[in-house]
A protein has these predicted regions:
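Active-site loop-to-helix "anion-binding N-cap" substructures in soluble metabolic enzymes
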Residues: 1-219
Length: 219
């Protein structure tokens, strides 16, 4: 049986105090974490909470990811957070989310740079695509298919279509392919039971640690 990756993208939510509350509620399930076999849990908080989350889950089989990374290395790049800095707190990084492609005009060339600099610094990219025809940089191992219409809409793609897209992506390379877009505790198994889907990327539902834990249990 293959491992399902269950990824939480908390996006630009949660203050320091709210993040502490999230952690406390999620850790209430700590005793049952060992029962989550064949599931790898990755939580991607905002930059301001990377230290809190990485410290809270130290020694527990929960991985931490960042939501973004600078396309530059160390240097005079005011406001940027580079891969070397992120590596102190996280193992994974999200690259290519449609919100960043749209709101920050991130191009395929920029995403390639982000991917390369992440891998060169020991981070594992989770590369997000919106279609089966997306350009995926060399070296990527985990791809998340997130159709734009499904993000935060409550209107997910059909499991059958998501599985078909995942199959096309896998035909190009041996990726682990995740599905993202309006994932809930009620529908998650419809996706993870498909042959070509290796997990889910959870957005809105991950803001509630109880909902996210239910998704993990049901996946």
């Amino acid at each position: 049986m293959s491992t399902n990756l269950i990824v939480a993208n908390i996006k630009s939510y949660e203050t320091l105090e709210e993040g502490k509350s999230w952690i406390e509620k999620f850790l209430a399930h700590k005793d049952s974490f060992s029962n989550l076999t064949q599931k790898e849990i990755i939580i991607c908080p905002p930059f301001t909470l990377l230290l809190s989350f990485s410290s809270a889950f130290l020694g527990i089989n929960i991985k931490i990811g960042a939501q973004n990374v600078s396309p530059f290395g160390e240097g005079a790049y005011t406001g940027e957070i580079n891969a070397k800095q992120i590596k102190d707190f996280a193992e994974y990084v999200l690259i290519g989310h449609s919100e960043r492609r749209k709101n920050f005009a991130e191009t395929d060339d920029m995403l390639k740079k982000k991917t390369e600099i992440s891998m060169n610094n020991g981070l594992k990219p989770i590369f997000l695509v919106q279609s089966k025809n997306a350009i995926i940089p060399q070296g990527v191992e985990v791809v998340a298919y997130e159709p734009v219409f499904a993000i935060g809409s409550g209107n997910p793609d059909t499991p059958e279509n998501a599985d078909e897209v995942a199959g096309v992506l896998k035909s190009e390379n041996e990726y682990q392919v995740l599905y993202g877009g309006s994932v809930t505790p009620e529908n998650v198994r419809n996706f993870t039971s498909k042959a070509n889907i290796n997990g889910v990327l959870v957005g809105g539902a991950s803001l509630d640690p109880e909902e996210f834990y239910k998704i993990i249990e049901n996946a």
